């Protein structure tokens, strides 16, 4: 055995110390205890924040959701098959963020903002946290500007304002998505940017929506955030929050945006799945206790902010402009049960709801909106002049018709006034029908509603009302373009326009017999 001198020992120690690599980076690392169904239990992560991104050994990211004394429960944002017990996990020190900005317009991205449309990488470096606190009361402004959906039934009876949350609720396959897509298509010339968030839908359905938006030239002002049925529950849970952050980019810079969540029922189911796997106590319908907060903190971010807020946010770059984010959440009911847990929650959070009914849809009334129980709590202040003036009579005519129609089933002989009201109501009901992907301008809607209110439809055969409307609008566009321009997108309405519309309709009625 070789003997070492004391001096040699000190030299060896010195060399070892010189070679020692002392890194200044302190890593907060933990170890995976278990992996199952996209949920990972981790031991040893000391300084982790709620909602913080954590990185796994295979490069996949996760999000910390359960912070317990001895362990951390996290959801994996992506594929979890490569993860195994004993692998190292490290904190990133960052809250989950997604890309935002104009570069996203026209693109299809996943819940993390990664492009999935095969059009290459995004060119921007601007990001925003997925979870943000909604603007306070002082930062907000009242809703007084309209969002035109282009659908007569909605713009007349349940008007939507910029910054409003209007729920679209109904059973499956009765046109909820169709209403939202028509609203997006109608924003082509309004400057409103749109975000369509697809949660838990078939990939074929999402592809069909994207194709329709492209066909109608609406993809240029739209971002599609897709979390399909095959995506992990964590991605379906995050998609609405990611889409909202993208919409807030426009709102906070003094622009207007519209976001559609299709649909929040599937997001609630995904969150229920995550919560049960994280062993959180189940409540009503096995949903966790904070499912109301899940949707309230999301929908409160849709708002109209005042000019001071925008100026402060942009450091004085944008002055004198208000911004808005309008939300159209969709909820799917089971057999028309609107008293279930999630539907009642979202009804109480939103500023109104559009009820779509199966029996109306099956009887050919599309959009299948029940005008009696559909309501807009704040949109009335945002309605254009012509719609406000004419819309009330339309709602009244439909309400009277519903009441009399039920009564007329049992009465054999009706007096003249009742019969007239019934016939008028039938024609107004027929007039509210509208084909998909054919939104109307404010001036066109105003003309048609004026015709109904002034009795120009009363001598038209019920089966010819739709034909009458189409031919009237074609005639107005060719013969009375100046009058339509006078009404304009602002919905102007005065004595001159009233006289002009009366004269035009009388002239049109003489062109052929109805």
Swiss-Prot record:
The record's section on SUPFAM superfamilies has: C-terminal domain of alpha and beta subunits of F1 ATP synthase (SSF47917), N-terminal domain of alpha and beta subunits of F1 ATP synthase (SSF50615), P-loop containing nucleoside triphosphate hydrolases (SSF52540)
- Binding residues annotated for ATP, in chain numbering: 170-177
> According to UniProt, where does the site described as Required for activity lie?
374
Q: Name one GO molecular function term.
A: ATP binding
Q: Which organism is it from?
A: Marinobacter nauticus (strain ATCC 700491 / DSM 11845 / VT8)
The entry's cellular-component GO terms read: plasma membrane; proton-transporting ATP synthase complex
Protein family per UniProt: Belongs to the ATPase alpha/beta chains family.
Q: How does it sit in the membrane?
A: Peripheral membrane protein
The gene for this chain is atpA
Record-given protein name: ATP synthase subunit alpha
Where it sits in the cell: the answer is: Cell inner membrane
Q: Lineage from the top down?
A: Bacteria, Pseudomonadati, Pseudomonadota, Gammaproteobacteria, Pseudomonadales
What reaction(s) does this enzyme catalyze?
ATP + H2O + 4 H(+)(in) = ADP + phosphate + 5 H(+)(out)
Q: Which UniProt keywords apply?
A: ATP synthesis, ATP-binding, Cell inner membrane, Cell membrane, CF(1), Hydrogen ion transport, Ion transport, Membrane, Nucleotide-binding, Translocase, Transport
Q: What class of enzyme is it?
A: translocase
Q: According to the UniProt entry, what is the EC number of this protein?
A: 7.1.2.2
